[in-house]
Amino acid sequence: RRCHETADYLDHLLDERPDLHGAALPYANHDELAELVMTRLWNRTRATDLQALADISSHEECDFWIALAILLRVFPDPQSDPALIALATHLVDRINAGTWRMRYSETPIVSPRGVELYSKLSEGRPELSLSEETMSRALAHAAWLARGQKTATRFAMFNGAPIWAANNLEID
C-alpha cells in the first residue's frame, strides 16, 4: 500500500502496526488529524481504533470540529460496547466544558448542518447531548465560517468561473 500523505501513513500504521501509531501521532498537524478522522473507515468495535480516536482527541491540535467529527463517527447505540459509550461521553463532557477551541477546520461538518445533525442524533440521550451554550456557540461559529468561505477569494467568481481557476489558466 502506498502512503502519499501523513493521514495515509497514520491510517496504514493503525492497520498494520498499531504499536507505532501512538508514536507517530504527535507529529501530525491539525489538517492531517482532520483528514484521518474524516477518511478512515473506523471500526467501532476494534480496541485499537477506539484508542486511536481517544489519542486524537487528546492531541494538542484537536479542536471542537475534530472532536465533533469523532463523535459523529462513533455515536453509540444504547446497547453499544461500554468502551465506545465511555469514549463518546468523555468527548461530550470535554466539549461541554469548553476544552477545545473553535477554529477553522478541514472537517466537512463545519457547518450549521453538521451541528444540527449531531443535535438530532443525540435527542433523548442527555449523556451525549451538547449543552445549549455549546450548541449556540457552534452554530454561530459555523455560520461565521460559512459566510467567510463564500466571500473568500477561492470561492469568488469571475465570468462564471472561480477566480482560482482563472488564475491557474495557462496563458500563451
Label every model-predicted segment.
Residues 1-172:
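Alpha-helical scaffold segments
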